[in-house]
Amino acid sequence: MPYLLSASHIKLPYLLSQEKIMEFSREIFGSSFKNIERLLRAFKNGQVENRYFSNDLEWFKEEHTFAEKNDIYIQQAVEFGKEAIEKCLANTEFLIDKLQPSELDAFFYISSTGMATPTIDARIMNELPFNPHTKRIPIWGLGCAGGASGLSRAFEYCKAYPKAKVIVLSVELCSLTFQRNDISKSNLIGTSLFSDGISCVLICGDEVSAEKFSKKDQHLKFLDSQSTLMPNSLDVMGWEVKDQGLYVVFSKDIPTIIKDWLKPNVESFLVENGLMLGDVKDFIAHPGGKKVIDAYHEALGFNESMTAESMGILREFGNMSSATILYVLERFMIRGGNIGEYGLAAALGPGFSSELVLMRWK
């Protein structure tokens, strides 16, 4: 079965503490909310400590048009995306020798925070030495579920083409969607949580020799995936596209939906693979926020040790939309696992939807 060979992430140039962002939010939103101090508790209750951004704090104090923000998205997505790819293909944590972009058979590009045609993958391929016949699969609009969905689609590609090497690159510059004049509670909560992130993983078909390329004795191998769309839930999460740009849609009911909907979804998927919740040893969860992680515990009966890696990423980086789960996955790949144990990746996104990926250490 296809397996994970390498991974990378990059730290964007501007590191801001949650305290500093909270002060900025008080300055920007203070006159618009009568209960601003109560609302600002979200910055502390969410347990995010630091976040990385592609622009400095002064940039957010100024007005920017949708066109200007999207132009910056294109420029920075190419710049930082190239860096993440090169790091993934040369990551000495995982690889014996550096791989070349020309060795890749397919390029999955995941994003929801900016738009480009030609897509970012095409622009990157013009700047790195890719084979011009590399298959390009850009995937847009899956939000926080996008990283897990990209993982699923890449695994399925390598299952069909067992000699293939493919990358999944996720670029999310959530901060470029910031609306300083949006005085909705959703925008304030989003400001307390979201950040910028770039991550990349390298996946290989089972006819690609792990012994030739990998420093690791164990790898997470793909077993199955499941995509699920909840009917009549379009208003739970997503964007409203307006003249000024992208406005966040973020329902307060998301934790409740997870508690009620996720467990039967996960259990039926595991049963189809002859497993139960207790068989999952590594839970590779997208940390949508502290309340989302708490909802995982309540819905699935997992203790805090099962979400420790996810919680660590949330504390250090915040919610980077689709990129976040790949940061979590990299932590598991560095740590390694016991042969035969199962890992389950899970992420939730607009639709409302979920993506589950079942893997096993081999």
Q: For each predicted feature, which ranges?
A:
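Short, well-ordered amphipathic alpha-helical segments that serve as non-catalytic structural scaffolds
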Residues: K44, V48, Q76-E93, I120, ...
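Short beta-strand segments
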Residues: S6-S8, I110, W140, K165-E172, ...
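A contiguous, well-structured pocket-lining segment that forms one wall/lid of small-molecule binding clefts
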Residues: E68, I72, A90, K98, ...
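Acidic-glycine-rich active-site phosphate/pyrophosphate-binding loop
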Residues: M115-F130, L169-R180, L234-W239, I293-T307
